[in-house]
Amino acid sequence: TNIIPNLLPEGVAGFTEYLKGRVALPLSGSLPDFERVLHHELVHVFTFDLIARVLERHGIHDFRPAPLWFTEGLAEYWSSEWSTFGDMILRDALFSRRLASIAQMHFIYGTFQMYTEGESICHFMADRYGEDVFEQLFQNWWRAEEFEDVFLLTTGETLAAFDEAWLYSLRKRYLPDIAQSDLPSKMASVRTGEGFN
């Protein structure tokens, strides 16, 4: 394409340019694929506009973007149903020890795995806090500059604690031995201090 000056990474179907106010979409001949990508990109348009309006309403004119894993995860979450393909990606990442925690998302930045993990995180957020957690996050966007702080203000839980709970839920879901029992850290408490025992 000559719409943008650089090459699109593999797996990028469409993109939203907020500053230019446009969305670019492919037309591969598959109407279901086109509709899914259109929904995904319209979620970006909606969320970028919502964040800008919330900030503007509170006199803040600097745009505070969300982390990419969240924006792409939310766009996937709101544009399609969870699939067995998503299960396959997460299971493979977990089994091969490549599953990234939220704090490690920069290692998989922009990859399909990041989109899938982000979608999984959004599903877990909705299950844990209720579907309206996303609206509450956006309405609180003006209250802090960092996503972690907005998350804490909205949910009452640190992003690190949430991350640990999300990773634990994936292990329970995909690792049969843990599903039958539990991790040692969840069943027992530490009885010793530092050093060798």
What are these regions (language model features)?
Residues T1-H61, P65-P67, F85:
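Juxtacatalytic substrate-recognition/specificity segment
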Residues A24-E41, S101-F107, Q180-V190:
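Short secondary-structure transition/capping segments
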Residues L42-F46, L74, R91-F95:
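Preference for long, solvent-exposed alpha-helical segments and helix-linker "stalks"
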Residues G59-Y77, K172-A179:
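Amphipathic, soluble alpha/beta structural segments
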Residues D62-P67, F95-A100, K186-R191:
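Amphipathic alpha-helical surface "interface" segments used
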Residues W69-F70, L74-F85, L94-G156:
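Active-site-proximal alpha-helical
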Residues Y109-F112, Q136-Q139, R143-N197:
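Beta/coil-rich, acidic/histidine-enriched accessory regions frequently appended to metallopeptidases
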